[in-house]
Every structure is written in structure tokens, then in C-alpha cells.
Amino acid sequence: MKALVDTSLLVRYLTGDPPHLAEKAAQVLDGEETLGITEVALVETAYVLESVYGVPRKEVVDALLALLQKENLRAVGGDKDLWMRALLLCRPSRRVSFGDALIWAAALASGVKRVYTLDARFPEEEIAVGPPEDPGPG
């Protein structure tokens, strides 16, 4: 692998906007070169597509799933299968953020049974979530 891709390249590729940059992005992503993608780029791309471009959640997830299935794209510092599982978790609901879904999937994959969070919307499927228990007075 000679290069990683960043959010701007992914957004141009997925939106086609603006066309001259989308074409450059397509040349890179649709080429033969093996490329790396990070979890940060994935989460940022999801955020930009949803919040800046107004793409519906299901379409964002479907686009990112298709992207992750590209043969020449490798996960750097993560696991593509885990990322896809997280995306599928947040596809049907705006309640679960992409970031929280990735944390949830990482907990499941690593065998961790609890996630400390103060977020009432954190996914609870198959794990315990909530604030740390108060240890009481010193």
C-alpha cells in the first residue's frame, strides 16, 4: 500500500461534487493501486454526507458499505468487517451515531461486555451501557 485516502477524496467520489474533483477521486479509488482507509476518514465522510450534503442515513450507510467492499481498499488501524457491522447498526436509525456504532462494534468484537457512557442514545444490544458506578465515599 502506497497511500491512504482522506475524507475530501471520499466525499468527492461519493457525491460527484464538483465534477472535476470527483473525476480525480474516481481515478484514484477505481484504479488498481491498493489504498488504505482509516476509521476517522470513514466517520468524517459519514458526517459530511449527512450534515453538509443532506444525504439520508440509509443512503450514507449503503454508499459507505459499497466503498468498503472495494477490493483495492484496505482498513488501516481497524477491521473492515467490524466497520460494516457498525454501519449496519446505525442504518435504520438516526438515534445511533456512526461513532457510537463503531465503539459498540469494537466492544462486541473484543469481548468487552460494558461501555461506560453518559449518552442515553448509545446502542445497548448485547452489551451493558451506562455511567460508571459510584464507588461511594473515599
What is each residue range found by the language model?
Residues E39-Y47:
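Short, conserved active-site loops that position catalytic residues or coordinate cofactors/metal ions
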